[in-house]
Amino acid sequence: NRATGTLYAPGSTFKMVTLSTAIEDDVASESTTFSSPGTITIGNAGVSNFNKTSYGTQTLEQATWWSANTVYGQLGVQMGADKLVEGAERFGFNQDLDFPIVMYTSLMAEPSEMTEWETAWAAAGEPVNPMNHESPAGPQATVLQMAMVGSAIANDGVEMKPYLVDGVYNANGQRSFTAQPEKLRTSISADTAKRVRDILKGVVKQGTGTAAQINGVEVAGKTGTAEKANSNDSWFVGMAPADNAGVVVAVVIEDGDEGVGTQKSHDILQTALEVQGLI
């Protein structure tokens, strides 16, 4: 099952984790400003925006809308590897999860082994390992892990334990088992979760995620493009309705064109909302 048994570079969807950590730990706020050149040198190596686009001066909120790697690289260095990894672990990275089928553990590197350049790229969602250190490069995530990140943000910072079987019916059509919601952890405060959701609304309203818009329903989410040697994976993690989510999705399209993950997520979100009677 590739949703639970494959590790991917989460690309810019991981910026939800970096953003949440920055706000939760008072490293930066929505209105903190950064310079966003197309390429910047951090730790004696380059960090670049997609297509090396320069955005001038941006707030952290705006940098999230447009997914500016050079801003998130600076933010990662500002918070440091320790805080970045701790923030990811609050969402479940480096944590084993008891699950009915094979579930790979999503990974972050050991902070003491991370270079400044590696920390910058990790904050932007790209795992690099320039020193070939003993711990794995990070972030690496399952699709389910990124869905759980989205769910925690949608659920006022509380991450619930995932399950596969919602109910069991006997031969008479009577329900003999009903799964009960179970809290797994508190990843961030309710205030941080709301502030992050407000920023993610802007991603869909006017940023890189406009293809996820649904008429009559406010959607919040984060796009991602994970670069590989010869192709990219296209990501989207989204929630709707944004402030009272009935649905959270995480989609990765392997070797997908830019934006296709967002388009597919739109279709899934819309269908799920229709089934629930929310649209």
What does each model-identified segment do?
Residues 1-6, 20-253:
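Beta-lactam-recognizing serine transpeptidase/beta-lactamase-like catalytic domain environment
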Residues 175-180, 265-279:
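Short, gly/Ser/Thr-rich active-site loops of penicillin-recognizing serine hydrolases
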Residues 146, 258-269:
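Short, charged, low-complexity patches
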Residues 18, 83-84, 265-268:
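Generic structural signal for hydrophobic residues
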Residues 230, 243-245, 257, 271, ...:
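Intrinsic structural disorder
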